[in-house]
């Protein structure tokens, strides 16, 4: 998904999977239900890839005591074409896998870093203050 292949990433989800964004900024859905909805949303988000150049990504995967659940920390960095500055973005994913498919993915992304990356800090501030 970090590499801009959201539609392909969606194929890893079960037909009735749920993708959540608990810290979703204004204008972004907090929950997507079903592989098709996930594919449609991630496909639409691929246009945002034109706003930045990713130079690298790192991930750390942590096992849990639940054999169906892994926790992953994904950080990518590069250049924001919107701000003309380097960026660093980290998200934490709590992923439940059953029968080889993702059934639930809770994506705890940093909405402030995302707003900076996309040049939308003003929109985020206005949404938070009601301005």
Where are the language model's segments positioned?
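A beta-strand edge to alpha-helix "cap/lid" segment located at domain peripheries
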Residues: 46-131
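Short, aromatic-enriched amphipathic alpha-helices that serve as compact interaction elements
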Residues: 1-5
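A solvent-exposed, acidic/Ser-Thr-rich amphipathic alpha-helical stretch
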Residues: 7, 12-68
């Amino acid at each position: 998904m970090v590499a801009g292949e959201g539609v392909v990433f969606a194929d890893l989800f079960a037909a009735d999977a749920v993708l959540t964004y608990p810290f979703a900024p204004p204008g972004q859905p907090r929950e997507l239900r079903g592989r098709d909805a996930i594919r449609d949303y991630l496909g639409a988000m691929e246009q945002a890839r034109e706003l930045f150049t990713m130079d690298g990504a790192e991930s750390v995967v942590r096992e849990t005591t639940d054999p169906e659940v892994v926790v992953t920390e994904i950080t990518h960095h590069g250049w924001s074409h919107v701000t003309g500055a380097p960026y660093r973005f980290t998200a934490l994913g709590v992923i439940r896998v059953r029968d080889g498919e993702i059934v639930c993915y809770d994506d705890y992304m940093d909405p402030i870093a995302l707003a900076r990356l996309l040049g939308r800090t003003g929109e985020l501030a206005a949404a938070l203050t009601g301005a």
